[in-house]
Amino acid sequence: MNDHRPDMSPVVEMTRQRVVGPTRSSHPIYVDLLPPCNQTCPAGEDIQAWLSLAQAGKWKQAWESLIRDNPLPAVHGRVCYHPCESACNRAELDSSVSIHAIERFLGDKAAAEGWLPPRDAAPSGKKVLVVGAGPSGLSAAYQLARLGHEVEIRDAGPLPGGMLHFGIPAYRLPRDVLMQEIARIGAMGVRITLNHKVVDVLAEKVGGGFDAVFVAIGAQAARHVDIPARDAAHVVSAVSLLHDVGAGQAPKLGRRVVVYGAGNTAMDAARTAKRLGAEEALIVFFSDRAHMEAHAFEAEEALSEGVKIKWLSSIRDIGAGALQVELMALDAHGVPQPTGKFETLRADSVVLALGQHAESDFLKDIPGIALTPDGTVIVGPDMMTGAPGLFAGGDLIPGTRTVTTAVGHGKKAARHIDGWLRSLPYEAAPKHPVIGFEGLHLPIYSDAKPSLQPELPTALREGFIEVTGGLSEADALHEARRCLSCGNCYECDGCFAACPETAIAKLGPGRGYEVDLALCTGCAACFEQCPCHAIDMIPERIPA
């Protein structure tokens, strides 16, 4: 027998008027938030956008979306240090999406299929000179060509690519991969003039009839270090070593090679020395591992190939076949201090990898140009120097020195150059708030192991064959589908199914959903189930 009385309470209308009892205090709206991968990409790629296309197997559309921001995906998939993956929310769940591996897959597939980028604008009648064919110069030239401008790159070297060609070993970046992506930029009408060192920018600007100039010569000169070296000592810079190897002129280093420094370039130099026949490649660094500049995986790869590292040691003297190091010790603040204890190390060659600087003296006499003490050029938010129509970027300006940062500079400069040429200043669109892991609703997700790239066995790493392989199409698809689509709706229909009032209508593929506030009770069922936080609940405005 049921002892409960029947429910005699009236049905309360919660959406249109204030009544006695509950009212709707909030209602849902669809939002777009900024994924952390997008936020941290130095090239400004819309990573989530091209990943969503890759998830659907729309490879060409994904590549076209990617190259709106970066013309070198096959290169970046190999050499970028992928800060996007360090920020990836999926790392809180199991492991980051291998964004760089998918980017590489798209770049390699584009080369294999012969895909070409579209032009976005009619010819403008304007000409732009780009000085330097490195990543920043190539990026700027590509973007300017897409915007309808006539572009010529002039570079002092015999081959385009800058430090991509002469600073990154082929076991990390095969030269055919690099040249294929550069050739695609050339196919857009960009003229690349080699063996042409620009020494008078203003004269070349006037002589060539250029309307603007972008200078991106990079930082290809080794920093001077004051270490006593005897006449018979064989000392080279890491910059010159990698340059010579890239030019096909491998030097003879001997059986024992010491590399001084612990940045990424030092790791490349030591691994290159092993490939050139050195029986022993020893990295010497004045501090400890926690303070090295190289990425941890770079050091691990070097160690796996037999490179040795001697920490807390500072070179004091270099002689023929040997060098003297002083042992260091960290003080209470973590700063290396000399101990007065010395050791002698045997070495046929010493490679100095202590940083690089830009050779910018040819710019110092141009009115309006301002240089920092280390030779970098000061630019404004629009990438323009103090000289009207003269822009600069890449390693030539202060800031982080990576390939991806340089490409981002080139894109940004191109957009500002375009605005300057058209007298329509470029303004970047405002960014949405960033969505963190705590804002996601992920119970529906299960662990999905990442797709691993194959590695060349250590025993076979004697030459400059590429060490890391690419993903198969199936693995690339799996990896793309690990993306959580943080902050942006991917039309999973979860909200549509969860609404108890049928207040949510589907607008069709690619158009999202719409909330009928006449039916919505503000229960937040849609918000609470949305896995990617593409829905927010906002307070209801109730008339006084």
Where are these regions (language model features)?
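Iron-sulfur cluster-binding cysteine motifs and their immediate structural context
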Residues: P35-A56, G77-L106, E152, L159, ...
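Feature captures the FAD/FMN-dependent oxidoreductase FAD-binding
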Residues: A122-P123, K127-V131, M179-I227, R316-Q324, ...
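FAD-site-proximal beta/loop scaffold in flavoenzymes
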Residues: A233-R255, H333-T400
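N-terminal Rossmann-like FAD-binding beta1-loop-alpha1 element of flavoenzymes
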Residues: K127-E150, A266-K274
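Rossmann-like dinucleotide-binding cores of NAD(P)H-dependent redox enzymes
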Residues: E150-I192, V245, A270-I315, P425-F437
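Mid-to-C-terminal Rossmann-like scaffold of FAD/NAD(P)H-dependent oxidoreductases
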Residues: N2, S9, M14-I29, E301-S304, ...
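Glycine-rich dinucleotide-binding loop and its adjacent helix/turn
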Residues: F105-A121, Q180-N195, V201, A222-L276, ...
